[in-house]
Curated annotation (Swiss-Prot):
EC number: 3.1.3.48, 3.1.3.2
Active-site residue numbers: 13 (nucleophile), 19, 130 (proton donor)
Gene, per the UniProt record: ACP1
Regions that span the bilayer: none
InterPro entries documented for this protein: LMW_PTPase, Ptyr_pPase, Ptyr_pPase_sf, Tyr_Pase_low_mol_wt_mml, Tyr_phospatase_low_mol_wt
Organism classification: Eukaryota, Metazoa, Chordata, Craniata, Vertebrata
GO molecular function: acid phosphatase activity; non-membrane spanning protein tyrosine phosphatase activity; protein tyrosine phosphatase activity; SH3 domain binding
SMART domains assigned to the protein according to its UniProt record, in alphabetical order: LMWPc
Protein name listed in UniProt: Low molecular weight phosphotyrosine protein phosphatase
Keyword Acetylation: yes
Record-linked PANTHER family: LOW MOLECULAR WEIGHT PHOSPHOTYROSINE PROTEIN PHOSPHATASE, LOW MOLECULAR WEIGHT PROTEIN TYROSINE PHOSPHATASE
Modes of activity regulation: Inhibited by sulfhydryl reagents.
Alphabetic keyword roster: Acetylation, Cytoplasm, Hydrolase, Phosphoprotein, Protein phosphatase
GO cellular component: cytoplasm; cytoplasmic side of plasma membrane; cytosol; extracellular exosome; sarcolemma; synapse
């Protein structure tokens, strides 16, 4: 069997405690279930420094537990190196996209393709809204969007 090149994806949201760790965990489960996890480097990060060092929001952890998806992450902020080392940087909303495009312009070599994760949604829900000020059902909505988008992204990038 031919050796497959490793691809990499970084999921990004504002604080890296709600949406992006859910997307990261969902994508890890997808590539693990398809036995291609060794072909992917997967991580998540924040555009802001608000939550650095914190675990994912407990409501997101509960949601993932209900779906049987392991989730372990410590919030971190995106770095200049991330723009040079990841193939894809997928974010959740227009504000993230603006911040990432601005930050990428400060990097000499940006190899990452920066996109909205929602651009892969077959249901055309472009924005994955921040559930931080919401309730459990808002986290479930984020989870469902991430599942749809990550599946579609994996099919396209695979």
């Amino acid at each position: 069997m031919a050796e497959q090149a490793t691809k990499s994806v970084l999921f990004v949201c504002l604080g890296n405690i709600c949406r992006s760790p859910i997307a990261e965990a969902v994508f890890r489960k997808l590539v693990t279930d398809q036995n291609i996890s060794e072909n992917w480097r997967v991580d998540s990060a924040a555009t802001s420094g608000y939550e650095i060092g914190n675990p994912p929001d407990y409501r997101g952890q509960s949601c993932m537990k209900r779906h049987g998806i392991p989730m372990s992450h410590v919030a971190r902020q995106i770095t200049k190196e991330d723009f040079a080392t990841f193939d894809y940087i997928l974010c959740m909303d227009e504000s993230n996209l603006r911040d990432l495009n601005r930050k990428s312009n400060q990097v000499k070599t940006c190899k990452a393709k920066i996109e909205l994760l929602g651009s892969y949604d077959p249901q055309k829900q472009l924005i994955i809204e921040d559930p931080y000020y919401g309730n459990d059902s808002d986290f479930e909505t984020v989870y469902q969007q991430c599942v749809r988008c990550c599946r579609a992204f994996l099919e396209k990038a695979h």
